[in-house]
UniProtKB/Swiss-Prot annotation:
BP terms from Gene Ontology: iron-sulfur cluster assembly
Pfam families per UniProt: Fe-S_biosyn
A GO molecular function held by the record: protein-macromolecule adaptor activity
UniProt name for this protein: Uncharacterized protein in nifU 5'region
Top-rank lineage group of the source organism: Bacteria
Family: Belongs to the HesB/IscA family.
NCBIfam families: iron-sulfur cluster assembly accessory protein
Length: 125
């Protein structure tokens, strides 16, 4: 199951409000093939039939069944720093990540943080 930190919930509550919420539903988190490490996270506002529904106070998120194994145990946070602000995925299923931290690799038996890897894109932990 995906977990959202308080910072992520607060940011999403402000971002997904009003007409957007009424017309498009809630936030959908998915994993797709791509990125320099093999998989990338996707966030959008369109739910699809069959998605798992998770509620965090005022925020509802959807996770598609195909992405669920990659997202089990993931903690989504919202962080602000000198390089900007954005959502950070801490993924215990990742066996490696690219240097920019935007994509990850996953394989059987491995576990590490999806924090940016030293040495640049494609560097495994």
């Amino acid at each position: 199951m995906v977990t959202l930190t308080d910072a992520a919930v607060n940011t999403l509550e402000l971002a997904v409000t009003g007409e957007v919420r009424r017309r498009r539903g809630r936030l959908r988190i998915a994993v797709a093939d791509g990125g320099c490490a093999g998989h990338k996270y996707q966030m959008g506002l369109e739910a699809t039939a069959g998605d798992d529904v998770l509620t965090f106070g005022p925020v509802t998120i959807f996770v598609d069944p195909t992405s669920q194994p990659f997202l089990t145990g993931v903690v989504v946070d919202f962080v602000e720093g000198v390089e900007g602000a954005g959502f950070k995925f801490d993924n215990p299923n990742a066996t490696g990540s690219c240097g920019c931290g935007k994509s990850f690799s996953a394989g059987p038996g491995g576990s590490c943080s999806s924090a940016p890897a030293p040495g640049g894109c494609g560097t495994a932990h």
